[in-house]
Amino acid sequence: MYQLGDVKKIVLPGDPIEVQGKMRNGVYRGQDNRYYSEYFGTLQVNDQFVDVVPFSGQYIPRKGDKVIGKVIEVGPSTWTVDINSPYFAMLHMNDTPWRMSSGDLKRYLNAGDYIYAKIMSVNEIKESWLTLKEPGLKKLEGGHMVLIHASRVPRVIGKGGGMVNMVKELTATRIIIGQNGLIWIDGPIEGVTMAIAAIEMIEREAHTEGLTARVESFLKELKGEKDGSQQNKADQ
């Protein structure tokens, strides 16, 4: 199965998509039943989903951003991290809360692990360095990852955090949102499923008015259906 960081190459409009997975954003099916790119951008495979992310809206690293990234390579003193950008990020062992010696990095973070980190510097060619040395920054254990368009992140967060707090409350989940479009969700599977559905709805309808109320109604309806189903099982 492909993972984030396994496939990331530049594609043009009309280029055939020749990887396996569930086609999602930026991909269309031609008359020959093959899949093609809609945009000039990067082909990305995250778990079982295939997306083409246009360069015009792809995440560009900025100093101070908090992002979720996946470790893709472990060196003697640094980790290379995929942050859902055309540019990889680096994390040095001195910028973590752990005391370790060079060459011992895999004990703390190995390839495939996810982290919630802060971008502490970005150079002129967009290479960025991360830190885990602030409260709340950490290795992410368990949970489920959702990838959305980075430009939709403010809509998922909502004014004053209102949207994401409402989703967390109605789904009994914990949610961490990276400004690069990766979102970590943990909790009971029913709640996680509901939260993912809500986030996908927000991404899809981000340009519309009255979205918070519709998402709240959507989640309450889902919750009611699940509660009713559980009650029916208990009565049988």
Swiss-Prot record:
Cystine pairs: none
InterPro entries: Exosome_RNA_bind1/RRP40/RRP4, KH_dom, KH_dom_type_1, KH_dom_type_1_sf, NA-bd_OB-fold, Rrp4, RRP4_S1, S1_domain
Localization per record: Cytoplasm
Keyword Signal: no
GO annotations of cellular component type: cytoplasm; exosome (RNase complex)
GO molecular function: poly(A) binding
Purpose: Non-catalytic component of the exosome, which is a complex involved in RNA degradation. Increases the RNA binding and the efficiency of RNA degradation. Confers strong poly(A) specificity to the exosome.
Similarity annotation: Belongs to the RRP4 family.
UniProt-recorded name of the protein: Exosome complex component Rrp4
Source lineage: Archaea, Methanobacteriati, Thermoplasmatota, Thermoplasmata, Thermoplasmatales
